[in-house]
Every structure is written in C-alpha cells, then in structure tokens.
C-alpha cells in the first residue's frame, strides 16, 4: 500500500492490513434509523465515542482494545427508565480486548471473563429496581449470550457495534477484485430476517493524503425469508397490496477510507434504504469518523 499512484490502474495487488507497532485513536460513531409506517415517522438515534488501542504483539498478532464512552440514546418512544436500563446493559461490553491478525480477523476475545463478571454486577444492580418474569427472562438471555464467545464476537462485528472499525474488507485486492460476503439484518423489519449480499472493491487512492477507499454495494438475497417479512408487516397493521408489493432494497452504499500509513480506518459509513410497498420504509445510517486532537479537547 505504500509505493502506489493516485489511480489503481496498473497495480497488480493491494494488501489492506495493519502497518503499525502501536496506535491510539478516538472515533465518533453514530447510528440513525428512520421508520415510516402508514405515514407515521419514528426516529431513533445512538451516538457514542470510541477509543481504540492497537498494539502489535508479533508479525501476525495484534491486541485491540475498544473502549466506549458517552453513549447517547434518542428515541421518543422509549422512556427514560428504559433508556437507563439499555445504557446499563450496553456498559457490559464497553471495554473489550481482542486478539487479531494483521487483517483484523479475530482469533479470540481476551477479556471474556471480565465481561461476564461485569454482566453479573449489572444484573445485581438492575434487579433491585427491575422485577417481573420478562426482566428475569432478559437477564437469563444475557447470561446465555455472554457465555458464548462466538455470539459475542458476531455481535461485536455488527455494524451497530464495532463492525465499521473491525470491518471485513481488510484483504488483498487487484484492480478487478470484488470481495463478497453475506450479512444478516434484524432491524429492517421487526421480527424478520433480511439477508444482504455485500460486494466490495477498491475505488480510489489519494497518494497525497495517504488514503485508500473501498466502496461497498449491497443487494437482497435468500428470498425464503420473505414469508417472515410479510407476516411481520401484516401483524403491524401496515397497508400493502399483496398482489404486487414485495420487500425492496432501494439503496445500500458503503464507504471505508483507510490510512495508508497505519492501515487503520479513518472514516466509514453504510447507508441503507428499505421499503415494502408505499406504507413501510426504513432508512438506516451507520457512521464512524476519526477525531483529531482538536476534536478531543
């Protein structure tokens, strides 16, 4: 990635990976969802600050610590008590330590025991003011979830968590390379799964700024989930034409800008527009922006 020109023409191969011994950086993350149902609009937003510490152990191994600060929830349908409950649960994994290779493939979750201990402490505190069968069911679900490292890592790599930083686009590329993968979304339609096929390629290189951009496009796959979507839309009382209305991915665009000197992400975004007929629309935006020293002061 170091000895290249401002275009990707003539380049045989690009290897996007970490190039550093130690790196500390603050990021600003935001997620916004806008749902329109029968003309009614609901907006939900999450903002947080993330601090990353990347430390090289050896040629192939890195330790990455991700700490979350200042989480802010904006949702008019969620009470202050519910927001506080969600914030306390979110604190369980607001400090994670991962072992990865130089392409950010995760080898293991280093501090899983500490995360489980943190969960039990949160449950003990929350149980004093939150009671009932549903609360107990939630607590048990969380215990089961955080006892399974595979489920934790899948969640961590979700775009709404740390997926923009720990993105899957660290890889070797040629000018014609297209990297493909499948992503499952649970927030397009309530109680329904939507599968998206992502395709990524290198778009451009800015030699002066030492930046490389990978763009991502997406399309719906696995239509066998459509029955689940139809059922959820119907149960929500959303008006639609059963003869012609179908789930539709109107937009799925992503951009990942890498620092060519370090291999870390400088800026990343995913923009999604989904619809079902005229009366159900969902837009989702994920953004991660590197903060400079002036922003941190």
What are these regions (language model features)?
Residues 2-297:
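Signature of exported/secreted
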């Amino acid at each position: 990635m170091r000895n290249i020109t401002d275009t990707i023409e003539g380049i045989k191969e690009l290897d996007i990976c970490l190039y550093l011994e130690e790196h500390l950086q603050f990021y600003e993350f935001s997620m916004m969802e806008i749902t329109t149902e029968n003309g009614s609009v609901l907006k939900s937003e999450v903002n947080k600050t993330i601090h990353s510490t990347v430390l090289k152990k050896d040629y192939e191994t890195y330790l990455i610590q991700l700490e979350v600060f200042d989480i802010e929830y904006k949702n008019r349908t969620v009470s202050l008590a519910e927001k506080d409950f969600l914030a306390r649960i979110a604190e369980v994994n607001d400090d994670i330590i991962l072992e990865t290779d130089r392409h950010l493939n995760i080898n293991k979750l280093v501090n899983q025991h500490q995360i489980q201990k943190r969960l039990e402490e949160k449950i003990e505190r929350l149980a004093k003011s939150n009671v009932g069968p549903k609360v107990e069911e939630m607590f048990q679900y969380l215990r089961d979830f955080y006892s399974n490292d595979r489920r934790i890592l899948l969640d961590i790599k979700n775009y709404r968590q740390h997926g923009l930083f720990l993105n899957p686009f660290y890889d070797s590329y040629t000018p014609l390379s297209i990297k493909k993968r499948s992503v499952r979304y649970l927030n397009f339609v309530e109680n329904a799964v939507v599968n998206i096929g992502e395709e990524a390629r290198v778009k451009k290189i800015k030699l002066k700024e030492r930046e490389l951009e990978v763009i991502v496009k997406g399309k719906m796959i696995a239509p066998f989930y459509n029955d689940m979507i139809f059922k959820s839309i119907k149960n929500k009382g959303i008006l639609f034409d059963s003869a012609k209305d179908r789930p539709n991915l109107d937009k799925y665009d992503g951009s990942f800008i890498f620092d060519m000197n370090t291999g870390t992400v400088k800026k990343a975004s995913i923009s999604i527009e989904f619809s079902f007929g005229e009366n159900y629309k969902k837009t989702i935006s994920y953004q991660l922006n590197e903060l400079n020293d002036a922003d941190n002061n």
